[in-house]
């Protein structure tokens, strides 16, 4: 399943490219996606971070400090920076998380779940230090999704009634 929400697609195919270029990386990694998400302050994934009371500034700094540039022969100013193996696995895990929640798309919230699920990732370590486990993140995702569904339903009802 590679059916991305609009925001997730924008993060994965555009914004993280900018972050990889900015940090001098020759491959896209999950940290680039999360950094782009935090900077854009948009999407359900960002809402999940806020609901979990993640300090956005320290999380962003943690991501930035742990991104290492690499010089492996690929020019950073190329049109499209390729995804790393970790990034491919990250997307696969996001798909698994999406399916486990009964969703038919991969959204930014699933990207957060995937990042926390990757054992040695910067995000997983940050969340562990904050005392937040994967189950808590899933609960937060469900809350944010249900709020979104109810607001969409209310908006639709309003249009029908008017």
Show which residues each predicted segment covers.
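Histone-fold recognition with a strong bias for associated Lys/Arg-rich disordered tails
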Residues: 1-162
């Amino acid at each position: 399943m590679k059916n991305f929400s609009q925001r997730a697609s924008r993060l994965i195919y555009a914004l993280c490219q900018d972050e990889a270029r900015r940090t001098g990386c020759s491959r896209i990694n999950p940290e680039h996606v999360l950094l782009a998400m935090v900077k854009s302050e948009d999407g359900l994934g960002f809402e999940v971070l806020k609901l979990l009371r993640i300090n956005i500034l320290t999380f962003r700094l943690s991501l930035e400090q742990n991104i290492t540039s690499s010089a492996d022969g690929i020019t950073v100013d190329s049109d499209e920076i390729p995804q790393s193996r970790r990034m491919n696995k990250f997307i696969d895990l996001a798909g698994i998380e999406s399916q486990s929640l009964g969703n038919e798309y991969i959204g930014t919230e699933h990207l957060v779940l995937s990042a926390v699920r990757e054992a040695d990732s910067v995000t997983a370590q940050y969340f562990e230090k904050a005392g937040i486990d994967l189950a808590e993140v899933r609960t937060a995702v469900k809350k944010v999704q249900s709020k979104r569904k109810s607001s969409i339903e209310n908006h639709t009802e309003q249009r029908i009634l008017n």
